[in-house]
Every structure is written in C-alpha cells, then in structure tokens.
C-alpha cells in the first residue's frame, strides 16, 4: 500500500503545496531565462497522422476499444444504485455502483432482445436501484444480475445466470473509473497510471463532486483538438484576450510519467518573483494540466482564494474528422455552498467558450486545410511543444504505426 491510496492518512494540501513550490522554482527559472522546457528538436508529422482513415481505424480499435479509457470519476456514482451512461468510445455502456460499493461496467443492452436499458446518452446519470428494460421489463440489479423476468415460464430451460448483463472490464483507482469498452483483460489501473499515481493522488479526485457537464465538438481529428491542451505556445496569439492576459506564452514546465504527463503554465505573477529570494516567496497553491493516456486532460486550478475546481476533458473521435469532447467541472472537495457552485459553473462556462470558439475553431480550420494539402505535406511540432510530441509518439507506439 502506498501514499497514492486515498485511505492512507496524508496531508494532501501540504503535499500539493510542496508540489507547487517545486514547480514554482522551475517556472521562475524559466521565466528568468525567457525559455521553456524543450524536446531534443522539432518533430515533423506527415499529414496522414491526422487524416488517414486506416490510422483512425487503428486508433479506434486499439485505443478507444482496447485501452483503459476514463469513463468518469468516483463522484459521478457516489452511492449504491447510482449509474451513468458512457457511450463516447463507441459501445453504449452503463457504469453502476453496486450495494457492495464496487463500480462495474455493462453493455447498455438487455439480454432478452438487445434493447437499450437506459435510452439517454452520455453525460446522463441517474439513481436506479433496479434497471428495467423499457421493451419487456426485464429487470437487473446494479451488479448486472437478472432479477425480474415477466412470463418467466415462457423461458423455461433458459439458464437465468447466462442472461445477466454483459460485463466490460472496469477498475476504480484514485477516484478515476476506467473501462475497457471493447472487453478483454481485466484492468490493472495502478499499472496503467504507473508513476503518475502520486501526482494524481494529491488531487484527491475521489472527493470531487460533479457540478456541470456538457459536450463540445470540433470538425477535426481528435488528436488535432487534443494537441492544444499540451502547449502554451499559442497563448499570446490565439488567447490574446483570455489566458494570454494572465499567463506567459511559450513557457512551460513538463513532467513525463510513462505515457502520461503534467504541464505547468506560469502566470505573470511568477515573473514578480525573479528578483525575490525564495524564502520570501508567498505560499503557492497547486495547479496544473494532467494528461492521462490516451485522451483525457484533467486540469486542477482555482476560481478564488481557497476555491478550487477540477476540469476533465475527455476527447473522442466520432469520425476521422469529427471530435466530441465530454467536458465536466467538479468541486474538488465537495460543493459546499451555492456561491461556490456558481463559481465552478462560471469556470465551466468561461472555459467552454474559449475552447469551443478558439481552440476548436483553429483545429477545425487546420484539419480542413490538411485534407487539401500536398501529399508530402508535414506539420511540424516544435521543440517548445515538448508534451505534444510525447502524446503523438505514445499513440503511434500503441497502435503500431510510425509517425512518418
């Protein structure tokens, strides 16, 4: 058992502040040097990385069906009988909380004649002590067991247990609920997260309470949209009236943890500390962008003094050139007051406006241009776009296809 287990008594606020101070030291140095943490050099990517249908199919099957995919947080199903729909990866799946406290995932399909048990789409959630099919009223408990079957005699000789819901691998770890949508081996979530566990544990995601959810879309390949979360090179130009007003452009501190990473983007207040002795620096709260392979970004930040929020972006392909982002904001340590809830909702609305109208706008335009670019055209990911390079390298490795 390690400190990353939320049951271990740890002062997580102190841990976050320790992480914040370590990150601050690096960012003060970067701002002083007017530099950023870099890869060894630029990385050219053939346009096919974004537009090739064969590559997209490999990503769909090997990543979105075969890898552990974040379906939600523990707080999305806090009580036995709670459930939510997870259908963005392809198959319609329901994730439930059983009486034993375990999270489970099942195909959203009645084992009688295949009807949908829950007809709503993601991000729908509900409390149902019993899950009843709208077609013929077959009924299941949250553990997937068939417990109700009208005209039961009509199915004499049919093994009841064989008609329990069809389960998909599911694992809950550090407040994260992972599902392998295409089925297959059980999920070892601790192994999947690896060395990133201690960082994610400090976010106390098991305490996060959902505040607002929605969907953002882009007429772009999902990776083109994902790229914008991993670099701050564009802040001064694309976000000139928003984050460009508060944060340095093209300055970032990057930590890689296997296939995952964390990026810190310094605000202008960091520059004020360049000429100040470290022992005179004020206490700093933790914040950062956390990427969980292959498609999830978790941002931890604040909306005021001692008022934090967690934003989760989960990007999914609806086609080679169609992206759907399931976006949610959480109160990291519970909602508490109506005022705090309103602040979290405001953070959701402001972020959605910027991402949809700025980041996803240029992603859509860029993707359209790649479709008509010369056959030998390559985009280039700069050495200053360190984390973007890592994302593409790990995706290419996972699907077994070279980048060029």
Roles of regions detected by a PLM:
Residues 71-79, 159, 286-291, 328:
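Short linear motifs in intrinsically disordered
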Residues 2-14, 171, 176-404:
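C-terminal catalytic domain of Rieske-type non-heme iron oxygenases
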Residues 49, 53-54, 60, 74-75, ...:
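Solvent-exposed, flexible loop/coil residues
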Residues 59, 109-110, 132, 225, ...:
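Short hydrophobic core segments
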Residues 2-121, 170-172:
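N-terminal pre-ligand scaffold of iron-sulfur
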Residues 65-77, 149-153, 293-297:
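Short Pro/Gly-enriched beta-strand edge/turn motifs at strand-loop
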Residues 76-183, 187-194:
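Rieske [2Fe-2S] iron-sulfur-binding domain
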Residues 24-53, 121-134, 164-172, 241-275:
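N-terminal short leaders/motifs
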